Amino acid sequence: MKIVFFGDSVTEGCFELSFHNVEGVTDIIRDKKSVYHNILKERIEREHPELNIEYVNAGISGNSTVDALKRIEQDVIAQNPDVAVRCFGLNDVAGMSLDEYVSNMEQIFGTLKEHGIQVIYMTPNMYNTYVHGDVLPNHADMAAVLAGIQNENRPDLYYAEAKKRAEKYGCAVADAYRVWKKLSEYGVDTTELLSNRLNHPTRAMHRLFADLLYDEVVRLAEK
């Protein structure tokens, strides 16, 4: 079985931000070993060595559903996968209308299903809920904007509509966002669970994504 992970910076494997004062440049620390689909791969290889699965990372930092539609043919369909895990939203909720996001999601689900690809829609993590002291100075304004969006519960609306479209096309749903919200409701400081204190989950929280995907991926591989 071949599975493509189609998403943004979280899927690519982006974590902390580092600031170089001399050049005035912010770098993203990438860690392909700690990304959720590699954690998933290692667990399946350990617990189900009989399964033959090829894993493809098609995550690109900064991508939205607009970008996804531009590269879906090359990065997903041309790979001829059996399964596609798609996780977009972090770069949509902050700068795109709900109607456009829903329309784009519908096109993505529809295109993948037309090509006979099994789809798992994984909802993203939360944004920060306040401006953390670790946020780089040149990202403080962004942190304030994202906190406002999260505290208005705007992502709830976007991902709820996306789940409806996923169900319409018979896609499985791994609802990571719901788990993050539950953690927040239980008093967990979810901003501390973000490696860049903005929108990139910590390495430990990538394990949550892997755990949510595990059963469905194994089920599909055993078919």
Give the role of each language-model region.
Residues M1-A58, R71-N80:
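Serine-esterase "nucleophile elbow" of acetyl-processing enzymes
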Residues I39-E54, D67-K223:
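Alpha-helical cap/lid subdomain in secreted, periplasmic
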Residues G62:
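Histidine-bearing beta->alpha loop at or near hydrolase active sites
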